[in-house]
């Protein structure tokens, strides 16, 4: 089972991303919104294993220390497609605060998690919010046209955190949502 540390957004940012997910879905294009429990987010770390009992205190510290990190989504991006699918995402401006938060997650979980995915390592982290992860290459132009409705720049903030287990997707822990101050 894979464990994922996610940063969730304030209500307005969440709603803007969900609107894009719905627009993609209306055209028959898969998005994270197809999964009922999915929430718009930035992934801060992916681990093969987490000691859930001993990670509880560090996760609580993350919720306190990392509250209300500002974000500005300023562009759309594309992870190179394989022969069958591509990932289209909204990209936040990479700030010192965001990189410090990412580094802090790794520090807090270092003793409690293993098998970290290399593409979330410091120096390789590409912060993004997935808009579609299974886009056929032949539909990339169509998807980008739909995603252009995304209101860029979109300024918001990280408002809460969660620990997600995959296969099946389920939330194991989340911080209480902090009051967003925009």
Regions found by a protein language model. Give the residues of each.
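Short, flexible loop segments at boundaries between secondary-structure elements
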Residues: 151, 157-164
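Basic, often amphipathic N-terminal segments
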Residues: 1-72, 95-155, 171-182
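Charge-rich, low-complexity N-terminal segments
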Residues: 86-88
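A basic- and aromatic-enriched beta-loop-alpha substructure that forms the phosphate/nucleotide-
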Residues: 80, 84
């Amino acid at each position: 089972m894979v464990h994922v540390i996610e940063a969730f957004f304030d209500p307005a940012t969440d709603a803007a991303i969900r609107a894009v997910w719905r627009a993609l879905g209306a055209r028959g294009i898969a998005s994270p919104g197809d999964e009922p429990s999915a929430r718009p987010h930035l992934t801060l770390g992916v681990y093969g294993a987490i000691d859930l009992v001993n990670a509880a205190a560090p996760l609580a510290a993350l919720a306190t220390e990392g509250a209300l990190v500002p974000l500005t989504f300023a562009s759309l991006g594309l992870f190179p497609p394989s022969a069958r699918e591509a990932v289209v995402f909204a990209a936040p401006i990479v700030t010192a605060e965001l990189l410090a938060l990412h580094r802090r997650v790794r520090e807090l979980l270092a003793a409690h998690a293993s098998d970290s995915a290399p593409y979330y390592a410091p120096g390789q982290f590409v912060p993004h919010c997935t808009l579609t992860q299974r886009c056929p290459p032949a539909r990339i132009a169509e998807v980008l046209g739909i995603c252009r409705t995304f209101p860029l720049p979109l300024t918001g903030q990280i408002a809460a955190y969660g620990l997600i287990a995959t296969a099946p997707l389920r939330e194991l822990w989340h911080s209480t949502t902090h009051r967003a101050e925009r």
